Amino acid sequence: MLRVLCLLRPWRPLRARGCASDGAAGGSEIQVRALAGPDQGITEILMNRPSARNALGNVFVSELLETLAQLREDRQVRVLLFRSGVKGVFCAGADLKEREQMSEAEVGVFVQRLRGLMNDIAAFPAPTIAAMDGFALGGGLELALACDLRVAASSAVMGLIETTRGLLPGAGGTQRLPRCLGVALAKELIFTGRRLSGTEAHVLGLVNHAVAQNEEGDAAYQRARALAQEILPQAPIAVRLGKVAIDRGTEVDIASGMAIEGMCYAQNIPTRDRLEGMAAFREKRTPKFVGK
């Protein structure tokens, strides 16, 4: 696959306060990098907990929550891309070894935090993309489902497998999977705990794109970045408002959804970007959107 040249800034580790980490390279399990040059506007979140295959433990969740809280206020983030620093794995789901040490009350509190994390990802104002280059099981797939778009390697393995462990999806899987695939198919996948390949997931519509894995093991990331590059030139305010209209509109009846669309459209009318788009069309040139 042809790789597009881009300028890379260093990964910036985020350390959760008062927590010990088993992440690589300095101990942070969540790292952030803003791309530069032609890819400026794309921000990447690297999940990097190799000892536990990016399992959703306390430190991991705390760092990711803090990272999202910081990034959601940054208007320079036009696309947020989730990727893994652990080869062959996107996210292995819940940290069951850590879970075994919790009381029943602590389990309930932690799962509520997980649900809040997935809601924060879903509510992120800019488009989000999950690059699934390996296993995405249980909570790992729930994390991907919380993203707007999903790209998978054809060899990736994913599924809501909680029922095979005596559990049920508790971080949004029972709600987001049927909204993605329909009720009957979601029930089948959850009831059976079935695992899907990236290719099978693409056929069902669970992922937007499935690509053959490369030698480096990052084919899904490369395709996800190319998808982010398609979003970058578009008017960022219009894109964000389009996300709001879709997300909120699909939760209500169509008449209410049309009203939501109208409110979002009204917010976009006074923007400089709308005027720039009209001027560029009239002058037969490429628009230069600034997000204002």
From Swiss-Prot:
Q: Which residues carry this modification: N6-acetyllysine?
A: K97
In this chain, the site described as Important for catalytic activity is at: E142, E162
InterPro entries, alphabetized: ClpP/crotonase-like_dom_sf, Enoyl-CoA_hyd/isom_CS, Enoyl-CoA_hydra/iso, Enoyl-CoA_hydra_C
What is the superkingdom listed in this entry's lineage? Eukaryota
Modified-residue entries (N6-succinyllysine), positions: K97
Report keywords, A-Z. Acetylation, Fatty acid metabolism, Lipid metabolism, Lyase, Mitochondrion, Transit peptide
For this protein, the record's PROSITE patterns field holds: ENOYL_COA_HYDRATASE
Q: Alphabetically, which GO biological process terms does the record hold?
A: fatty acid beta-oxidation
Location within or outside the cell: Mitochondrion
Q: Which GO terms describe its cellular component?
A: mitochondrion
The record ties this protein, via Pfam families, to: ECH_1
Which Gene3D superfamilies does the annotation name?
Answer: 2-enoyl-CoA Hydratase, Chain A, domain 1 (3.90.226.10), Lyase 2-enoyl-coa Hydratase, Chain A, domain 2 (1.10.12.10)
* Residues of the transit peptide: 1-35
GO MF terms listed in the record are: lyase activity
Q: Which family does it belong to?
A: Belongs to the enoyl-CoA hydratase/isomerase family.
- Name of the protein described by the UniProt record: Enoyl-CoA hydratase domain-containing protein 2, mitochondrial
Source organism per UniProt? Homo sapiens (Human)
The beginning of the lineage is: Eukaryota, Metazoa, Chordata, Craniata, Vertebrata
